[in-house]
């Protein structure tokens, strides 16, 4: 019943969206406009936002390591808050892994899930003291999940070897974030062959992003096959929302006027409307609105709502695969280029 209600609501919202789109002149957009929008107005600013928050992690963790007496607890709270800020910025950036995120295998390097406590313990014993030493530490023992484990599951004590290692993990995160900013500043693909590859990659990664949120993060944990993401920090719901909002921004046409070609982030719906593919745009808008309603306020303890959300996300995936990709002449294929 709830799923049917969500579908009806989504259809009504999509109808309103279609009427709005017809009332607003939508210019023609090329694949180059779409790809440039993803890189310049999505990837680049999101990488900068993540780097800014990751840059504050070493100082926050270092303060915890140096704290004494009554200052220790507030220092841990501050380190945890800074981790949450960095994590949410990362979720927005990593929601659509394209370009340098794939080339640098950033999802594996920065977000290997779940963290491996035994490997973290081994890394603490090794006591890496600089960037070169951290390169020899495997991804399962560092990155955001490992730091979450060190701040919540087994909170590092001031002055302890584990705290010194947590500081190295934080510094490693900040370094990789800076490297992503530099990589994201490169010119987006322009020649015909590169553009075709980048377009196909981005469409496929959008499908993968929706499926990752649906299965790995929501449905699989409900079946006991995995833990909900960010459970230790209690930030699961925030993580889901950060990912979904980033995905939605790349799919759904906003209420504001469509961007002049080449000047902003271009949602897929807007791109479709600009190319006259109105039926596909309407179906996509309806599916996204159903998912948006089902994900709003969703928490790990939401019971049947979790299944409804997973079903709604499956609907978005099906529209992307069966309607959007063919309309854009993009072939959907399986890729294990990134992630774990």
Predicted features and spans:
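N-terminal leader/presequence-like segments
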Residues: 1-6, 22-26
